[in-house]
């Protein structure tokens, strides 16, 4: 520690306010510990805090520590002391032992002598008190021996003695410390057992009557008899104790300004030198782990409270106890489950962590507000790196070195006393869950959670079992910088792994950007935004004369910033001066460079001083020569560079540029000669030279032109840096990378300072680099301008794979566009390889597919597929597109990958650009059809080739469909002719191809006629092979769906004749034949009659019936009427004998087309089913008035009866059916008459025939109505004839004698509802009307209420008339028979209307009554009026007979 350096600053132990400080112990003030201070402002601030507090308490308490001085004079200003004895003079043996220990631990002890000479010691030594037990009592003005009477009963610990240790031994002794709370009103007794050695040491003293006391001094438990070891000579120690015992200590308030225990901040210290000296100073204080501390030590020993103080602070201590009990009881419970997650942010709060040494320890609870804390302003918060630090699980348990000096201020200690421990970090953020990973070491661990300056509480002692509550879970936030990201992912992961082939990743479209990771290395500009003013100070702590408990600063508690953590002393502090220099250059921040610096290289020492500028160049040249010729350690090199960089600021010696430039050239040349032995530290030196060049170029003596030239040279040097790195890359990557990362950052910052990033990229493009180096460049010097020329493309697999990973990264992360130059460069590589895959990709190559559909993305990660993906992301010009098209033919020796890649390339180009590459596709596949090529390959290979061409053909067909391009399809004809037909074994592949082919052709708006005509010979050839039957009909479907495109002439001349010749063989052919015949009929080539008569089939009956069935389905209505009778004739010939399914299918189609309601017919199993089928067919013949066909069918029945095909019972039942339903058509047929006589069929039906004859002879409608009306009047008068007559009338509804039977009888019924009231009895009208209603009910029941729309309309007319008549005629409702007949009719009509819109209206009519406004008469039509007159006339002429008849009388009386 250099005490002669200027600008020390005094900082108190605690930055607490006055009211937060309670004086516990105040030893004698010794100004030998004060250092000279020049920074008055910082000193005044610290002095003010202490002075104000001391003004409240003017009396000093009695000391409980070994060194007590009472005669202290305190002043308010700076006080200087005379020269005192140095530590080397007072403690030569101790310092020699410390020096030896440091040497064994590997520390640089070159400055040990200067440090030890500058240390000062207290002038007064204490004397050892010979006592076994010392009672700590209330403070009084009496001596210690007079205070016994005022003590309170002691509380002894559980273990009455603790074995003392030999502190002069080099062996570490584990400490034991146990604390517990006792009653605050009791005295505290600290006892320990005496060892044999201690008794011998105390034998020569005069204090045998006192107890063996142990006290707490600066957080350490000291034995008053052995506490001098390592601190003072024994004589001085005993003398101090004697003086303490005899002195009067008065309690007074004093003003304390500069005193012991005040930390002093040394300004502008070199971080590297400070770190070395700090490690030496750590051992000047005996570590706590060499002490034996009695278990269950009273807490007042630590707190230093005497009875007077406890009486005054009883309330405060009670609050203290309650707070810690509530706070740490919860922490203890959660300690087992709380983890240490490095992905979380540190909460910026002080650390209060109690030590825990084992289950037997007893931890005392201390108040939060009284917790002694030493706050330090972090001197490393200005670093340029912002890097998330990782700590291994092992280091997490022992962050603080066990060799470090520790103060047991309840777990808090100044960080300067802690020896930095080497910290390891892993690649993975979740490293705690892994057992072994690659170790990464970072120099600076920067956590910038807030921008405001803050202090940091430093934790002391070993890691407690209780996890720190500052272990955070939130990710570190950074201030981002535009266009400049130096990402740890890309420096760590990408350099080692990301450029290796990864099957799980693939290139993504440019539109889908990957979410960027939060950078671990923040940019230089971002640091400039977030850093505070750089202040580099060393904080040193010396023994204090006052102890205070500090309340937490609640206001700033949440904003305490944990800026940095440290790792190794040789690498932690490299960037401190570097970043300060960059700040001074870029931000014009004030920076006071050192006036000189001294460096020790090997056995030589060099001093560079501004007071002797003439020797600077010479000394530098000598230093450079030592570095070049002999070499130095990494630590020395880093220390030299940071010292020189800081020294060069404002030196204003431009001549050093050439000197450093010569060193830079030689050093770089030597590194180039090393190559495989190059290390990151070498590149750190080269980068440091660039920063030196930058400093020199900013000198005042440098002209603008010279500055410009220097900047140009600086850019050249940076390019040379990466050129050299590319040469030594493999060897450098085998070493820890922290120095290399540092060099990256320096170069990035330098380029930002000179604002020549784009000029640098112009130089980079002139010297292409490997993908690894290129990846570094885009991360160190990010740019959105596409700089693909920086990438060197090689045709080897691994470099090319890395190149594609680099390209992918630039596209997704850097937003670079794919340019024509990049595509053409890659195209040249693949063309040299004839578009074949690499041997390393053999497995992927075998599984590679042809792109189909063409819009699909390739999933295979083959190199060529990555290239194809890039093609989809660029906009090639027409000329460049032509250059990319593969023009060469496939040779005999080319692998299948050549065919796949070329086909895929054509498909991508045809899809992405407006090109029709069908011709090029045909040229590409032509050599594959040669016999020489096919004979050279195995059957499986030929099968694969055929499949590839088929898939490519489908893709080109789809592209033509999407873009509506003309498509000749010659290559498809060649495919079938040369490959498909020559390989019957691939019929399954062909079938799958034709399924897709048929689907695509059907979707095409512009169907290719030429393609179909080219394929026609292949179609005919495929029909000759049974193995291609399924494929043939799939291909034939293409023609059948394209008949209109092919035209009727070509279809008739080629396709129709070809299909007709094949139609005799298969029903599928017949269906195709009929489809083509329908097309030709629709085109007017011939008619259905011509097609049925002259183009029929001469094949078997089964095929003929199939042909007839299709004719029935395809022909139009008019053609069917012409063909219906011949088709019925065919059916009548086969009905009684055929058992073929084709016949029943034909008969079903025929009857359905003739509107005969019938289910699908199946072959009959017995005569009853055949008889029902004969009934249906006979009705169809009757309906179509085919009496001749009905007579023929009867004769066929007689013939089959005679032959025994049908039974007598069958014939008899069939004749009964004909006698009942077809008597009119067959009554003059002699065969019918004879068979009826032979089989004994009744002739009652003849009466019906006579009725029909009379009815037909009546003439017009009015005459027929008069005939019916007369007949019903006569039948009513007769009595028993009415039912028979109604049966005869019902036959009129099923015969053809009336055009519309329902209309005829509905008018006749309405005619009985007279417009004017007749002169005869109305009951006669109602009597006749009831019989007509019974007729309708009989007919509806016979027809199962199944009527046509016209018939339903007629029924609705009758329904309306009856409802109105019922509502208006009182006599209508007086007869129950009439009402029953009427209601039955209305219900039947409503049932028929159910579900139709008429139903509601009919229901409303039924609800009419006499109270409604209803017309008394129903208006009649002309026909109805005429019929009404005829009815009245007939009734009037037969009124006497009607009234005398029994049926009428009965009706009238009901």
UniProtKB/Swiss-Prot annotation:
A GO biological process held by the record: replication fork processing
Species, as recorded: Saccharomyces cerevisiae (strain ATCC 204508 / S288c) (Baker's yeast)
Protein name as catalogued: E3 ubiquitin-protein ligase substrate receptor MMS22
Keywords for the protein's UniProt record, in alphabetical order: Cell cycle, Cell division, DNA damage, DNA repair, Nucleus
Complexes and interactors: Component of a cullin-RING ligase (CRL) composed of 4 subunits: the RING protein HRT1, the cullin RTT101, a linker protein MMS1, and the substrate receptor MMS22. This complex further interacts with RTT107 and CTF4 to form RTT101-MMS1-MMS22-RTT107 and RTT101-MMS1-MMS22-CTF4 complexes respectively. Interacts (via C-ter) with MMS1 (via N-ter). Interacts with RTT107.
Family: Belongs to the MMS22 family.
Keyword Oxidoreductase: no
Superkingdom of the organism of origin: Eukaryota
Region feature Required for interaction with MMS1, mapped onto this chain: 1201-1454
InterPro entries assigned to the protein according to its UniProt record, in alphabetical order: Mms22, Mms22_budding_yeast
Compartment(s): Nucleus
Chain residue ranges for the region called Disordered: 159-178
């Amino acid at each position: 520690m250099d005490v002669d350096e200027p600008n020390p600053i005094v900082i108190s132990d605690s930055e607490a306010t006055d009211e937060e400080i309670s004086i516990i112990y105040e030893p004698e003030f010794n100004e030998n510990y004060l250092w000279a201070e020049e920074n008055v402002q910082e000193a005044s601030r610290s002095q003010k805090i202490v002075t104000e507090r001391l003004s409240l308490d003017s009396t000093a308490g009695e000391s409980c520590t070994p060194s007590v001085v009472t005669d202290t004079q305190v002043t308010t200003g700076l006080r200087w002391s005379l020269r005192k004895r140095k530590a080397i003079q007072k403690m030569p043996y101790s310092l020699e032992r410390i020096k030896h220990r440091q040497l064994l631990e590997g520390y640089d002890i070159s400055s040990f002598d200067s440090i030890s000479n500058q240390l000062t010691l207290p002038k007064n030594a204490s004397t050892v008190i010979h006592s076994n037990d010392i009672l700590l009592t209330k403070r009084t003005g009496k001596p210690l021996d007079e205070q016994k009477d005022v003590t309170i009963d002691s509380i002894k610990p559980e273990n009455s003695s603790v074995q003392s240790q030999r502190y002069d031994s080099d062996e570490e002794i584990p400490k034991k410390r146990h604390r517990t709370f006792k009653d605050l009103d009791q005295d505290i007794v600290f006892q320990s057992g005496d060892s044999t050695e201690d008794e011998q040491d105390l034998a020569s003293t005069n204090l045998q009557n006192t107890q063996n006391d142990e006290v707490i001094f600066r957080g350490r438990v000291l034995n008053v008899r052995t506490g001098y070891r390592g601190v003072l000579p024994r004589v001085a120690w005993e003398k101090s104790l004697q003086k303490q015992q005899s002195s009067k200590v008065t309690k007074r308030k004093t003003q304390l300004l500069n005193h012991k225990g005040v930390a002093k901040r040394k300004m502008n210290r070199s971080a590297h030198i400070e770190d070395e000296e700090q490690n030496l100073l750590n051992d000047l204080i005996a570590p706590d782990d060499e002490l034996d501390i009695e278990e269950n030590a009273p807490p007042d020993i630590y707190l230093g409270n005497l009875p007077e103080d406890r009486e005054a602070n009883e309330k405060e201590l009670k609050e203290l106890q309650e707070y810690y009990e509530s706070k740490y009881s919860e922490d203890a419970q959660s300690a087992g489950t709380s983890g240490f997650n490095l992905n979380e942010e540190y909460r910026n709060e002080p650390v209060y962590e109690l030590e825990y040494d084992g289950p037997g320890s007893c931890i005392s609870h201390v108040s939060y507000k009284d917790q002694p804390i030493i706050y330090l302003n972090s001197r490393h918060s200005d670093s340029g790196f912002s890097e998330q630090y990782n700590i291994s699980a092992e280091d997490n348990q022992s962050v603080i070195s066990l060799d470090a000096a520790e103060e047991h201020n309840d777990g808090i200690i100044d960080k300067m006393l802690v020896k930095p421990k080497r910290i390891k970090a892993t690649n993975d953020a979740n490293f705690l869950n892994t057992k072994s990973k690659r170790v990464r070491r970072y120099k600076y661990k920067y956590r910038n959670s807030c921008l405001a300056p803050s202090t940091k509480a430093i934790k002391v002692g070993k890691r407690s079992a209780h996890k720190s509550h500052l272990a955070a879970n939130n990710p570190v936030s950074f201030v981002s910088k535009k266009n400049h990201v130096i990402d740890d992912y890309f420096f760590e992961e990408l350099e080692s792994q990301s450029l290796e082939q990864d099957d799980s990743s693939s290139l993504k479209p440019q539109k889908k950007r990957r979410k960027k990771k939060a950078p671990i290395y923040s940019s230089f500009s971002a640091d400039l935004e977030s850093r505070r003013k750089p202040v580099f100070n060393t904080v040193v702590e010396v023994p204090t004369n006052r102890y205070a408990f500090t309340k937490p600063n609640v206001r700033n508690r949440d904003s305490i910033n944990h800026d940095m953590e440290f790792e190794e002393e040789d690498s932690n502090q490299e960037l401190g001066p570097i970043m300060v220099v960059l700040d001074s250059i870029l931000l014009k921040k004030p920076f006071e460079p050192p006036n000189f610096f001294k460096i020790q290289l090997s056995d030589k020492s060099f001093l560079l001083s501004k007071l002797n500028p003439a020797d600077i160049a010479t000394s530098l040249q000598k230093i450079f020569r030592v570095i070049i010729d002999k070499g130095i350690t990494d630590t020395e090199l880093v220390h030299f560079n940071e010292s020189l960089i800081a020294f060069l600021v404002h030196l204003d010696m431009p001549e050093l540029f050439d000197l450093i430039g010569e060193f830079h050239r030689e050093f770089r040349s030597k590194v180039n000669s090393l190559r495989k032995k190059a290390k990151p530290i070498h590149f750190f030196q080269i980068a440091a030279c660039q920063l030196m060049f930058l400093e020199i170029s900013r000198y005042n003596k440098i002209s603008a032109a010279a500055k410009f030239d220097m900047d140009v040279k600086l850019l050249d040097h940076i390019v040379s840096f990466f050129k050299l790195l590319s040469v030594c890359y493999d060897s450098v990557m085998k070493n820890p990378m922290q120095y290399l990362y540092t060099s990256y950052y320096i170069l990035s910052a330098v380029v930002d300072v000179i604002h020549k990033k784009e000029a640098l990229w112009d130089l980079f493009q002139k010297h292409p680099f490997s993908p690894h180096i290129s990846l570094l460049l885009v991360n160190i010097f990010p740019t959105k301008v596409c700089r693909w020329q920086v990438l060197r493309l090689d045709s080897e697999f691994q470099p090319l794979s890395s190149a594609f990973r680099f390209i992918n990264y630039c596209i997704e992360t850097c937003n670079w566009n794919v340019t024509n130059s990049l595509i053409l460069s890659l195209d040249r590589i693949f063309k040299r390889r004839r578009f074949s895959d690499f041997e390393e990709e053999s497995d992927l190559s075998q599984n590679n597919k042809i792109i189909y559909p063409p819009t699909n993305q390739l999933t295979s990660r083959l190199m060529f597929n990555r290239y194809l993906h890039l093609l989809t992301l660029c906009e090639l010009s027409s000329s460049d597109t032509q250059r990319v098209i593969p023009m060469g033919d496939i040779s005999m020796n080319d692998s299948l990958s050549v065919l796949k890649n070329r086909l895929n390339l054509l498909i991508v180009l045809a899809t992405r650009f407006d090109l029709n590459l069908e011709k090029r596709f045909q040229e590409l596949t032509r050599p594959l059809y040669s016999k020489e090529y096919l004979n050279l390959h195995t059957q499986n290979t030929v099968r694969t080739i055929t499949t590839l061409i088929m898939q490519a053909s489908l893709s080109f067909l789809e592209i033509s469909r999407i873009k509506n391009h003309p498509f000749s399809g010659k290559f498809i004809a060649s495919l079938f002719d040369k490959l498909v037909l020559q390989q019957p074994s691939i019929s399954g592949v062909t079938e799958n191809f034709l399924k897709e082919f048929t689907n695509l052709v059907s979707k095409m708006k512009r169907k290719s006629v030429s393609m179909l005509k080219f394929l026609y010979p292949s179609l005919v050839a495929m029909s000759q092979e049974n193995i291609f039957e399924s494929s043939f009909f799939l291909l034939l479907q293409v023609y059948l769906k394209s008949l209109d495109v092919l035209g009727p002439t070509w279809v008739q001349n080629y396709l129709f004749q070809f299909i007709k010749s094949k139609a005799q063989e298969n029903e599928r052919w017949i269906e195709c034949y009929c489809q083509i015949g329908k097309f030709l009929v629709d085109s007017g080539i011939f008619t259905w009659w011509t097609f049925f008569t002259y183009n029929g089939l001469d094949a078997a009956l089964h095929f003929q019936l199939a042909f007839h069935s299709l004719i029935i389905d395809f022909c139009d209505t008019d053609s069917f009427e012409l063909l219906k009778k011949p088709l019925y004739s065919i059916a009548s010939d086969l009905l009684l004998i055929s058992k073929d399914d084709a016949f029943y299918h034909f008969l079903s189609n025929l009857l359905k087309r003739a509107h005969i309601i019938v289910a699908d017919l199946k072959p009959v199993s017995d005569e009853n089913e055949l008889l029902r089928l004969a009934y249906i067919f006979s009705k169809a013949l009757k309906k179509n008035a085919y009496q001749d066909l009905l007579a023929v069918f009867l004769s066929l029945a007689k013939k089959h009866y005679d032959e025994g095909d049908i039974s007598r019972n069958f014939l008899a039942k069939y004749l009964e059916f004909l006698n009942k339903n077809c008597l009119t058509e067959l009554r003059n047929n002699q065969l019918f008459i004879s068979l009826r006589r032979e089989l004994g069929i009744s002739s009652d039906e003849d009466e019906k025939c006579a009725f029909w004859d009379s009815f037909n002879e009546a003439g017009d409608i009015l005459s027929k109505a008069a005939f019916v009306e007369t007949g019903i009047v006569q039948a009513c008068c007769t009595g028993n004839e009415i039912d028979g007559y109604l049966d005869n009338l019902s036959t009129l509804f099923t015969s053809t004698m009336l055009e519309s039977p329902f209309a005829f009888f509905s008018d006749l019924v309405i005619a009985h509802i007279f417009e004017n009231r007749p002169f005869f009895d109305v009951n006669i009208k109602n009597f006749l009307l009831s019989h007509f209603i019974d007729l309708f009910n009989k007919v509806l029941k016979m027809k199962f209420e199944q009527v046509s729309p016209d018939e339903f309309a007629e029924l609705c007319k009758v329904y309306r008339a009856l409802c109105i008549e019922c509502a208006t005629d009182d006599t209508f409702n007086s007869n129950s028979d009439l009402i029953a007949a009427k209601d039955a009719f209305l219900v039947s009509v409503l049932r028929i209307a159910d579900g139709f819109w008429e139903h509601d209206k009919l229901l409303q009519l039924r609800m009419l009554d006499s109270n409604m406004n209803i017309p008394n008469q129903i208006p009649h039509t002309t026909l109805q009026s005429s019929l009404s007159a005829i009815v009245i006339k007939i009734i009037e002429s037969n009124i006497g007979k009607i009234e005398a008849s029994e049926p009428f009388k009965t009706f009238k009386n009901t």
